[in-house]
UniProtKB/Swiss-Prot annotation:
InterPro entries: Ribosomal_Su5_D2-typ_SF, UDP-acyl_GlcNac_deAcase, UDP-acyl_GlcNac_deAcase_C, UDP-acyl_N-AcGlcN_deAcase_N. It catalyses: a UDP-3-O-[(3R)-3-hydroxyacyl]-N-acetyl-alpha-D-glucosamine + H2O = a UDP-3-O-[(3R)-3-hydroxyacyl]-alpha-D-glucosamine + acetate. Keywords: Hydrolase, Lipid A biosynthesis, Lipid biosynthesis, Lipid metabolism, Metal-binding, Zinc. This is UDP-3-O-acyl-N-acetylglucosamine deacetylase. GO terms for biological process: lipid A biosynthetic process. The gene is lpxC. Catalyzes the hydrolysis of UDP-3-O-myristoyl-N-acetylglucosamine to form UDP-3-O-myristoylglucosamine and acetate, the committed step in lipid A biosynthesis. Zn(2+) binds at H79, H238, D242. One of its GO terms (molecular function) is metal ion binding. SUPFAM superfamilies: Ribosomal protein S5 domain 2-like (SSF54211). It is an enzyme of class 3 (hydrolase). Its EC number is 3.5.1.108.
Amino acid sequence: MIRQRTLKEIVKTTGVGLHSGRKVTLTLRPAAANTGIIYRRTDVNPPVDFPADPASVRDTMLCTALVNDQGVRISTVEHLNAALAGMGIDNAIIEVDAPEIPIMDGSASPFVYLLQQAGIQTLNAPKRFIRIKKPVRIEDGDKWAEFVPFNGFRMDFEIEFNHPAIDGDDQRLVFDFSSQGFVKEISRARTFGFMRDIEYLQSQNLCLGGSFDCAIVLDDYRILNEEGLRFDNEFVTHKVLDAIGDLYMAGHAIVGEFRAYKSGHGLNNQLLRAVLADQEAWEWATFEEEVGSPVAFAEPNMVLA
């Protein structure tokens, strides 16, 4: 059977919080089968846990943020969550000593590297997938996102930015998920923002950790980063990365096709909630044979460069 996975070792890293600009220590710990992904704030007493669950997401203004009834929060979870999805990790405790996950380089790549350092441990319990059984769609003005049945996990995402630096041909991406494909084609895409927005946010004491080291920054005409883009379609690729992280807030891999036009964290979360609220829209699935699995995860001992 396809089994659940956790980490082999505890791993730690430090980085800067995007909004606070302060140093954050991130610790990833192994967890037992059926624990799920749990985000934990260790700088409050007692520590506060947030299970990976669409209902934990209560703020999607500038990132995906988990917030509890007391207002305790962990922001910017989507890139790490995408890395967990990409590596097929079902169970882990994610500890931070701050109200946000460190931004690192603005992509999921540093988190993939961290997970590879930890190693993957298979557990003696079946991996449970969420299989989409019927179409579900959410619209917001001209933006929309939907799930349709599909024997795999496919992302079909289109953005529409009228900007000289964003080529019209590079605004749509169709990606058939596999761990290898995620690491090579998706994980290195960085978040992006406009200089005028960053300056405004910083005047409001937000985005204090924002810099050319952790984002693609644009003015009205061009990309301001000296090194340019990592690949031509880095903008839409990052939106796919965000969506993979947002959808993994379900706590389980999904078997289905996600289609979106100009979607963002809020719409992604609304769609996930709508699917899970409709008992006819999905079912649990497990797979006896790796060969028969519609979603390809990396072998636990395979190092993905």
